[in-house]
Amino acid sequence: MRVVILGSGVVGVASAWYLNQAGHEVTVIDREPGAALETSAANAGQISPGYAAPWAAPGVPLKAIKWMFQRHAPLAVRLDGTQFQLKWMWQMLRNCDTSHYMENKGRMVRLAEYSRDCLKALRAETNIQYEGRQGGTLQLFRTEQQYENATRDIAVLEDAGVPYQLLESSRLAEVEPALAEVAHKLTGGLQLPNDETGDCQLFTQNLARMAEQAGVKFRFNTPVDQLLCDGEQIYGVKCGDEVIKADAYVMAFGSYSTAMLKGIVDIPVYPLKGYSLTIPIAQEDGAPVSTILDETYKIAITRFDNRIRVGGMAEIVGFNTELLQPRRETLEMVVRDLYPRGGHVEQATFWTGLRPMTPDGTPVVGRTRFKNLWLNTGHGTLGWTMACGSGQLLSDLLSGRTPAIPYEDLSVARYSRGFTPLRPGHLHGAHS
C-alpha cells in the first residue's frame, strides 16, 4: 500500500519506519530541509513511561492561579483570541478530577511502556545510536506534600507492573551521586529504574537515514497546502502546484495537525510551548548520571554524552515561538540549584518548541471517519517517550493486524463533540 506521512518529527519518522517494515511504500512530506528540526529538535531527552501523566491533574486549577503570581511558575496562560483555546482549556479543566486523572494516566503509561519495549527491540535490531542511556529517572520532591502525593501515582505504577523505589532524601545520592551536595533541599524522590534517556533529534535523524536506505522517500522543503477529500476518503495532498497521491494518509504534523485538518476532522490538539537549554558539561562528578525531574518546577535535567539538557515548562499561548528571557532564567536557576558544578551554563543554547497536546494528555492514534486518513499526533510532552510504540501501533492498525496493546481509547472518537478551530494562514505546512 502507498502511504503518505505528513511530518518528519520523531512520531512521523517512527511511523514511516514501522510502516516500511510492514511492507508499505512510504513517502514522508515536510516543509523543513530535514527531519526533527522543530519540536523534536531539543526536547528534554527523557524516555519516561512511568512518569507519563497528564497535565490535567487534581489541584492544577488552584495551582494555576498561584503560578500566575510566581516568577518561576511551570505553567503560564495567555489568551490567543481564539474560541478553540478557550474550549481546549475548558476540556482540560474537566479532566482535572481524580477519576479522569487516573484513567488518563493509566492509558498513557500503557502506551509509553509499550513504546519503550518497541524502542528496545529497535535498538537491538539496528544498533541505532542516539547518546542513549538506560539509567532510569528520578523525580525529586522539595516538600513533604509532594512526597506524600507520590503514593497516588504509585498505585498506577503497581497496576501497570512498573518497578519503582520511593527514596528518602538521604538515599538520593545512591541514584544520582552529585545530589549529595544538595540533599538538604529535598524531601525525597521516586526512582523508576527502567526509564531511559537520549537525544531525540539524533535518534530521529539516524532513523530517517535508516528508513531512507530501506526505501522510504522523504520530500523535504515541501510545504503542504491542503488535504484533498472526496466523500469519505482523501484523494491527495496539495503541495503548491503538485498533488501527491497515495492509498492512505497519516497526519503527524504535531501542533499543526489541527489547522491542517480543519473542515475534514476535528481534533483537540493545541500547542503547549516549552523551553530547553543545552549545556556543555563542566565537571563530570557534578553532572547528572541520567534524568531527574524537579516536581516543583516541572523541569527535567537529562545527561547526554558531553551535554546536559534542561527542559520543561508549559505555556498555553498559541503558536508564539518567541524566546523569553525569564524562562531561560528559570531553567538556569533550577540546574544551578541542583547541579551547581555540572555544566557551563553561560555557554548554553536556548530553544523553544510547540508540543501538540490534547486536553486529557493522551495522543490521538488511529483511523478517522475517513477510511484512508489516519492520525498519529497529540503526544504533548511525551512524543519521544511514545514515538516508537505509536508508530508500531499505527502500522499494525493500518496493516490490518491486531496490535499488542488495547488501542480503542486512543482514538479521536473519545472527543465525540468535536473541535473546530480557526485556521491561521501562517500555519500551512509540516511540523517536526
Swiss-Prot record:
A Pfam family found in this protein is DAO
- Disulphide-bonded residues: none
Q: Does the keyword Oxidoreductase apply?
A: yes
Instruction: Select a single GO molecular function from the record's annotations and give it.
Output: D-amino-acid dehydrogenase activity
Taxonomy-wise, where does this protein's organism fall, top ranks first?
Answer: Bacteria, Pseudomonadati, Pseudomonadota, Gammaproteobacteria, Enterobacterales
- Protein name in the entry: D-amino acid dehydrogenase
Q: EC number(s) of the enzyme?
A: 1.4.99.-
The UniProt function text for this chain reads: Oxidative deamination of D-amino acids.
**Would you identify the family this protein belongs to, as annotated?**
Belongs to the DadA oxidoreductase family.
Catalytic activity reads: a D-alpha-amino acid + A + H2O = a 2-oxocarboxylate + AH2 + NH4(+)
- Record Gene3D superfamilies: D-Amino Acid Oxidase, subunit A, domain 2, FAD/NAD(P)-binding domain
Q: What are the names of the required cofactors?
A: FAD
Say yes or no: keyword Metal-binding present. Answer: no
**Organism this protein belongs to:** Escherichia coli O45:K1 (strain S88 / ExPEC)
* EC main group: oxidoreductase
The pathway to which it is assigned is:
Amino-acid degradation; D-alanine degradation; NH(3) and pyruvate from D-alanine: step 1/1
Extract one GO BP annotation from the record. Answer: D-alanine catabolic process
User: What are the annotated GO cellular component locations?
Assistant: cytoplasm; plasma membrane
Keywords carried by this UniProt record: FAD, Flavoprotein, Oxidoreductase
- The entry marks the following residues as binding FAD, namely 3-17
